[in-house]
Structures are given as structure tokens and as C-alpha cells.
């Protein structure tokens, strides 16, 4: 899986460096953060709906869309996968106390 995600990220980076006519990725990068963020919000909402409907196939499809749009945002903001990996590694194994986290009470 790591190779597939890295390949997707590299493809998005390549589109930024060498735009391809008609590319959806280039469209998003050209429109900028507001458009990318709107798409992330839409796709996250679709994940929530799929999960509420207990539709595994749709959850998987919509999560792929979320990951793609998040990768586009990272590329747009010049954030590398290595930076994300470093942060994940730093958090791995740390104990997080639930009482220190803000309660989500809007559901």
C-alpha cells in the first residue's frame, strides 16, 4: 500500500511541476487552497454518509477521494510525505489520555 500511496503523491507532485492539459489535479492546483479545501469537505461528508449507511464499498471509495484531495492540498502547500511520515513516527507509541482531549458533543 505504501508504494501505491507514494506513487499517487509523486504523480500529483509531477502535475504541479509539469502541468498536463485537462488534468483534474492541475485544475485543483490552479484554483488553489479554497477549492481543494471545499473538495476535502465534500469528500469527508461523503465518507460520513457512507459510514452512517454502513456501506463498506462506498466508505472505501470515498476514503480514496479524501486521501487524493488531501495529497493535492499537501502538494499545494509544499508539504512532503516525509514530513507527514515524521509526524506519524513521532506520535507512534505515545500514550494519549482521553481526559486531555476535548469532548465532541455536537453529534
UniProtKB/Swiss-Prot annotation:
Task: Provide one Gene Ontology biological process annotation.
Answer: L-histidine biosynthetic process
Task: Provide any one GO MF term from the record.
Answer: ATP binding
Instruction: Check the record and name the InterPro entries matching this protein.
Output: HisE, PRib-ATP_PPHydrolase-like
Q: Its catalytic activity?
A: 1-(5-phospho-beta-D-ribosyl)-ATP + H2O = 1-(5-phospho-beta-D-ribosyl)-5'-AMP + diphosphate + H(+)
- Pathway noted in the entry: Amino-acid biosynthesis; L-histidine biosynthesis; L-histidine from 5-phospho-alpha-D-ribose 1-diphosphate: step 2/9
Subcellular localization, as worded in the UniProt entry: Cytoplasm
EC number of this enzyme: 3.6.1.31
Q: Does the keyword tRNA processing apply?
A: no
- Which superkingdom is the protein from? Bacteria
UniProt keyword Cytoplasm, yes or no: yes
Note the Gene3D superfamilies from the entry.
Answer: MazG-like
One GO cellular component assignment for this chain's record is: cytoplasm
What keywords are assigned to this protein? Answer: Amino-acid biosynthesis, ATP-binding, Cytoplasm, Histidine biosynthesis, Hydrolase, Nucleotide-binding
Judged by the first EC level, this protein's enzyme class is hydrolase
SUPFAM superfamilies in UniProt: all-alpha NTP pyrophosphatases
Q: Which family does it belong to?
A: Belongs to the PRA-PH family.
Question: Protein name, please?
Answer: Phosphoribosyl-ATP pyrophosphatase
Taxonomic classification, please? Bacteria, Bacillati, Bacillota, Bacilli, Bacillales
Name of the gene this protein is made from: hisE
Amino acid at each position: 500500500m505504501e508504494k501505491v500511496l507514494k506513487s499517487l503523491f509523486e504523480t500529483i507532485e509531477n502535475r504541479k511541476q509539469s502541468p498536463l492539459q485537462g488534468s483534474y489535479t492541475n485544475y485543483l492546483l490552479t484554483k488553489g487552497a479554497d477549492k481543494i479545501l471545499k473538495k476535502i469537505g465534500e469528500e469527508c461528508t461523503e465518507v460520513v454518509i457512507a459510514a452512517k449507511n454502513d456501506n463498506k464499498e462506498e466508505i472505501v471509495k470515498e476514503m480514496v477521494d479524501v486521501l487524493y484531495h488531501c495529497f493535492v492540498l499537501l502538494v499545494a502547500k509544499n508539504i512532503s510525505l516525509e514530513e507527514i511520515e515524521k509526524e506519524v513516527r513521532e506520535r507512534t507509541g505515545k500514550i494519549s489520555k482521553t481526559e486531555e482531549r476535548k469532548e465532541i458533543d455536537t453529534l
